From Swiss-Prot:
It is an enzyme of class 2 (transferase). Mg(2+) 1 binds at S93, E227. It comes from Cereibacter sphaeroides (strain ATCC 17023 / DSM 158 / JCM 6121 / CCUG 31486 / LMG 2827 / NBRC 12203 / NCIMB 8253 / ATH 2.4.1.) (Rhodobacter sphaeroides). One of its GO terms (molecular function) is anthranilate phosphoribosyltransferase activity. Binds 2 magnesium ions per monomer. Keywords: Amino-acid biosynthesis, Aromatic amino acid biosynthesis, Glycosyltransferase, Magnesium, Metal-binding, Transferase, Tryptophan biosynthesis. 5-phospho-alpha-D-ribose 1-diphosphate binds at residues 81, 84-85, 89, 91-94, 109-117, 121. Disulfide bonds: none annotated. GO terms for cellular component: cytosol. This is Anthranilate phosphoribosyltransferase. SUPFAM superfamilies: Nucleoside phosphorylase/phosphoribosyltransferase catalytic domain, Nucleoside phosphorylase/phosphoribosyltransferase N-terminal domain. Catalyzes the transfer of the phosphoribosyl group of 5-phosphorylribose-1-pyrophosphate (PRPP) to anthranilate to yield N-(5'-phosphoribosyl)-anthranilate (PRA). Pathway: Amino-acid biosynthesis; L-tryptophan biosynthesis; L-tryptophan from chorismate: step 2/5. Its EC number is 2.4.2.18.
Length: 338
């Protein structure tokens, strides 16, 4: 331990840290050079004042540099949310990932176990028979053979072991709730990323731009979820060519009906997996339409679809043809053979 972080804790409470100061601070955290009290002090100073784009970018760049990296196919996309919306929906981004992969777009999905719901991405995949506790080489093999791979955050970010206990003790949101979607170990350049607050979508788009993303949609559902909503309009910050455009998106613009929010509320991992299997078998309803909407957006971001309605058509075919279901079965086989 050292006292190198101490001076920056007070500074962080009174003014934004420069990119260089923030990088230094997070180097201290990730190298285990700070005491738990110092870590907590810094995280809460940032939270209370409000983190800046430079601070997000600095933390993400240090975290990316220290992760166990994965080589992904060209054009791979990540489909992920911050979590923390407290809505407990069915696993929409997880199902979306398989639908998009079934449409021929490589998906390098970064995720974790449940943080804000009864069933996070890793919980749902485990229930579906996948082994999520695999390392970078096995994930790369999955991406090459199946066109989809799941990167379990703790398997790829060992530096987080220093911070994890402090986060658990604080029991409140910190900058790390935002960093997951910004620190994909495959370094993908395209993202469909959900945020738990509409106030985060533009800053997160700015961070992804600073970190080299080519095209990304940052979204927040009007129902309060960290994905495109099927029950209301959603806010979008679309990054492309270094420019950010903000707009609202309604399900009907994609040719999809509006459904009551209650129809996509999830349950236990087993219950969510049952709904996921029904969706893969073609069961219609709010869950499928929510996945189709998010998959359509991901296909637009990946340049697989020119517009949302075309994306819905491609995503529907991925489900009804059995392609999405086949991706789940193949990934289950590959991960359990690893």
């Amino acid at each position: 331990m050292s006292d190198r972080l101490k001076p920056l804790i007070g500074t962080a409470a009174t003014r934004p840290l420069s990119r260089e100061e923030a990088e230094f601070a997070f180097e201290c955290l990730f190298e285990g050079e700070a005491t738990p009290a110092q870590m907590g002090g810094l995280l809460m100073a940032l939270r209370t004042r409000g983190e800046t784009v430079d601070e997000y970018a600095a933390a993400a760049s240090v975290m990316r540099a220290k992760c166990h990296k994965v080589r992904a196919p060209h054009g791979a996309i990540d489909i992920v949310g911050t979590g923390g919306d407290g809505k407990g929906t069915l696993n929409i981004s997880t199902a979306t990932a398989f639908v998009v992969a079934g449409a021929g777009v490589p998906v390098a999905k970064h995720g974790n176990r449940n943080l804000s719901s009864k069933s996070g991405a890793a919980d749902a995949l485990t229930e579906m028979g996948l082994n999520v506790m695999i390392g970078p080489e096995q994930v790369e093999a999955c991406l090459l053979e199946a066109g989809i791979g799941f990167m379990m955050a703790p398997m790829h970010h060992p530096a987080m072991r220093h911070v994890g206990p402090v986060r658990a003790e604080l029991g409140t949101r910190t900058i790390f709730n935002i960093l997951g979607p910004l620190t994909n170990p495959a370094g993908v350049k395209r993202q469909l990323t959900g945020a738990f607050s509409p106030d985060l979508i533009r800053p997160m788009a700015e961070v992804l731009s600073a970190l080299g993303s080519e095209k990304a949609w940052l979204v927040h559902g009007g129902d309060g979820t960290d994905e495109l909503a099927i029950s209301a309009a959603s806010k979008v910050a679309a990054l492309e060519g270094g420019q950010i455009r903000e707009f609202e998106l309604h399900p009907e613009e994609a040719g999809l009906p509006v459904h009551p929010f209650e129809e996509i509320v999830g349950g236990t991992p087993a219950e969510n997996a049952q709904a996921f299997r029904a969706l893969l078998d073609g069961a219609p309803g709010a869950y499928r339409d929510a996945v189709l909407l998010n998959a359509a957006a991901a296909l637009v971001v990946a340049d697989r679809a020119a517009h949302l309605r075309e994306g819905v058509e491609i995503a529907t075919d991925s489900i009804l043809s059995g392609a999405a279901k086949a991706k789940v079965a193949l990934l289950a086989r590959l991960t359990n053979a690893a």
